[in-house]
Regions:
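Proline-centered helix-kink/hinge sites
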Residues: 48, 81-82, 114, 161, ...
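Core alpha/beta nucleotide-donor-binding catalytic domains of modification enzymes
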Residues: 2-113, 123-127, 132-134
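C-terminal target-recognition/interaction regions appended to catalytic cores
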Residues: 217-345
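Class I S-adenosyl-L-methionine
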Residues: 63-73, 84, 88-262
């Protein structure tokens, strides 16, 4: 008898990093919802059969979705609602007008009553206001009958070549969730992730210039022999001259002191460290440079750092693609969570 595939609804799905991790663990994502069409175009391009809906979750009625698309039963709801409205000014923060997107996630859980939910967010959501927000989130879901567990996970503990921390809340009906143990003893380094990708651009659909050099590269290339999204940025000669002064793993402090103020943010002129996992990939990619080449990472390099397989192709302008990658949950970390959930359900 075939093993049951648990069904998933992904809210605030973006391009689909969380969805991908759950699919890798054997879940079946039935629907994904977001209001950014660029990310949804990428989501649809990489998945046939998943309904990817452009809708404003702020005012979306779960019953409408259930009726319109025949979704009567959802096993797991996943997603990362934006929580920019969370502040620590008062005790009713969670009911603040600006936190309606978070409340919409709660509303969907209340309507569908899934076996489990997984919600991800920024790590400091646990400590803001001495834990007021964390406690309010736990209460919201406890009132719906869930036992809520939470933890800050480090992506590099799960084979992602990136030191990215995310707060994860998991709710189950009858037990606490046991978060996954580390899946790697030695972290995957930036060199492991990127060393087979060339300095210059590759036309979409061209062959890889070299064979994979390590296990991570073999895994990330699995099933594909063509490269996509590896277009290198053309920096000014002056930018190239300045970054050339910064060594592997260095930052602006490696420059002459009179050049420290050339860019206004403290992370400017930072190079990846080839011997370690990368720092957190952001949505702009304007200040972080390759450990060896005098340029910012390509979209494919950033996707590798996030643990997206090379078979996952990003659509849209370069700026949009970078934002899609930077906003995503690393699929390998999502897989570790999903795999653990699969065992428990």
């Amino acid at each position: 008898m075939a093993k049951k595939k648990y069904t998933v609804l992904d809210l605030f799905c973006g391009c689909g990093g969380l969805s991908l991790g759950f699919e890798m663990a054997g879940f079946e994502v039935e629907m994904a919802i977001d209001n950014w069409e660029d990310a949804l175009v990428t989501y649809r391009h990489n998945r046939e059969g998943v309904k990817a809906i452009n809708a404003d979750l702020l005012n979306l009625d779960p019953k409408e979705i259930a009726d319109q698309y025949g979704m009567s039963d959802v096993d797991v709801i996943i997603g990362g609602p934006p929580c920019q409205g969370f502040s620590v000014a008062g005790k009713r923060i969670i009911d603040d007008e600006r936190n309606k997107l978070y409340k919409s996630f709660v509303r969907f859980v209340e309507y569908f009553q899934p076996k489990a939910f997984v919600m991800e967010n920024v790590p400091n959501i646990l400590s803001m206001g001495d834990g007021i927000i964390r406690d309010a989130i736990i209460k919201d879901f406890s009132d719906l009958g869930y036992i809520v567990s939470y933890k800050v996970l480090m992506a590099s503990d799960y084979g992602v070549p990136q030191n990215r921390r995310r707060a994860i809340f998991v709710g189950l009906r009858d037990k606490a969730f046991a978060f996954p143990e580390k899946t790697v003893q030695e972290p995957v380094t930036t060199y492991d992730a990127l060393s087979d990708l060339p300095e210059s651009s590759i036309e979409d659909g061209d062959n890889y210039p070299v064979a994979p050099m390590c296990d991570y590269q073999r895994m990330i290339r699995q099933g594909v022999d063509k490269l996509y999204n590896h277009q290198a940025s053309a920096h000014t000669p002056e930018t190239q001259r300045i970054i050339a002064m910064v060594p592997d793993g260095g930052n602006y402090k490696c420059l002459p002191e009179d050049m420290w103020g050339l860019r206004k943010v403290h992370i400017a002129w930072t190079r990846m460290n080839s011997k370690r996992p990368c720092f957190t990939i952001d949505t702009g990619h304007r200040h972080h440079f390759h450990y060896k080449y005098n340029r910012v990472p390509t979209v494919r390099e950033a996707a590798r750092i996030q643990s997206f397989p090379d078979s996952f192709v990003f659509i849209g302008s370069r700026t949009s693609q970078n934002k899609q990658v930077g906003n995503a949950v690393p699929p390998y970390m999502a897989f570790a969570i999903a795999n653990q959930l699969q065992i428990i359900l």
